[in-house]
Amino acid sequence: MAEKEITIAISRHRGLAPKAFEETYPSYGNQDQAGDMRNISLLDPNVMTQGPGMAELTNGDQGGVVTTLMRGILRQAVTSNVSYAFGGAKLYQFSASTVSSGGSPSWPRTVSDDGAEVGEDIAHYQSALYYSYNQTGSIGTIGRYDLASTFDDDYWDSGTPAAADLQSAPHQMVNGGDDVLYIANGRYIASLDGTTGNDQALDFPQNTQTASVTWNNNRLIAAVNRPAISGVNQNLSSVYKWNGVDASWEGQPIEINGRLGALYTKNGVTFVWYEGFLDGVVKLIFGLLAGGRVQPLRTFSGSLPLYYQVGELFDYIVWLSSGRLFAYGPLGGEIEVDLFQLMSPQYTNTAGGIASPFGEMLIASNDGGSNYSLERESGYATDSYYKTMLFEPSLGSLKSILDRLEIQCNKLATGAGVDLDLVDNKGNTLWSDSLSFTSDGAVTKKVFFPRAHGENMRLEYDFSAGSSTNPVEIKKTLLQGKNVAFG
């Protein structure tokens, strides 16, 4: 059989392939997609590069003032360069660079009511700050800070609203377009209309729990699990819509065979994260609400994101799963969308909340013990890697030889570097080399001649020997070779 030329051209390095979470060496998908990655940025569609590194804010750990895991992080600034977060029994104030310490009032502030306070969410509503939490006695409540000097930790039931205690449950809060603050409250939706509180503004069936709420199209949208239990279970959950006025929800809820984690609305589109059974196995699913149904977009693996672990960054939807931040987008429609794992906090053991009130991503995390952190983007990650799909160019009785590899990149700067490996699906390294400023200078292209033999192989980019200040920005990859007879 005559030799056959092989050309594998990657003009734009894409996000994770459809089966990337299910197989070690996925081969299904487009050849420009990834089989695996860690801390990789595709935010600039022109290049594949190291994802953002992360660094603690000043005072942003247990050696400073952060001694609890923050859940609710306000998604916007309240005043110039000032926002807030809530976790455990601590209410935090922070800027883009520093978690506040001391001052008047003194920060962080310890919330105190009936004991064992566990912070849930935080909201800016009608010129005041509201913070929801659970506490001793299987109850919840909401505190209020006037953004000057006065705190009322038991505002919901002992202050002006004089409402009944909330249930012990997730208490996400969302500002409605009708100028009402809506609160998830177990099998109910609670509401705060100015100073009028209602712990049961809307009720759902027995044995349910509201996991997340959002506002879209002048309606409250609620993700409600039934039964209200965690773990791998065949739940019959629903997404409800409510106009905030009627005694019941609108129309038929969207039923989901699985457990709902979170809702998030961006630009008039509501996205949903849930856990369900597909192909006989449990999968995590990211989708959107469309026409009275859920339209799945991608499956992924890890932990199910909760309401405080989803958000947005530029034109991307982002979420935490198993302690790592994923991004999906861009949503503008001009470029094909991708799913990629963008960045990771220093602790992936226990994930807290995320938000970008100042334009950069903030992530709270905990090591499972006494170490806590609030981090922001800083430089570039050096524990990054990107692995292509598995290429299977062999034909019949012929074997593949890849004898030319061309890497195009933006001009290298001091310290920039990436190690390259061709690996087969048995884990054998068929060839290794590197591209670096130290060895190659300020180049924009390098050609290698691997002469790597195999039935299949993939290209792996390892940035661990690179720089946290000068990244390698890969533009294009070209692999060329031929199929030849065995022997």
Task: Describe each model-derived feature in a short phrase.
Residues L91-Y92, I139-I142, I189-A190, V239, ...:
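Structural signal for beta-propeller blades
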Residues L129, T136-G137, Y188-I189:
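A short acidic, glycine/proline-enriched capping/turn motif at secondary-structure boundaries
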Residues L57-L74, V99-A123, D146-D179, I183-E312, ...:
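Beta-propeller and closely related beta-pinwheel folds
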Residues A2-K90, T98, E117-G119, H124-S127, ...:
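Beta-sheet repeat architectures centered on beta-propellers
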Residues F94-A96, S132, G140, R144-L147, ...:
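Predominantly extracellular/luminal cell-surface or secreted proteins
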Residues A85, Y131-S132, Y182-I183, A222, ...:
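Short beta-strand motif characteristic of blades in beta-propeller domains
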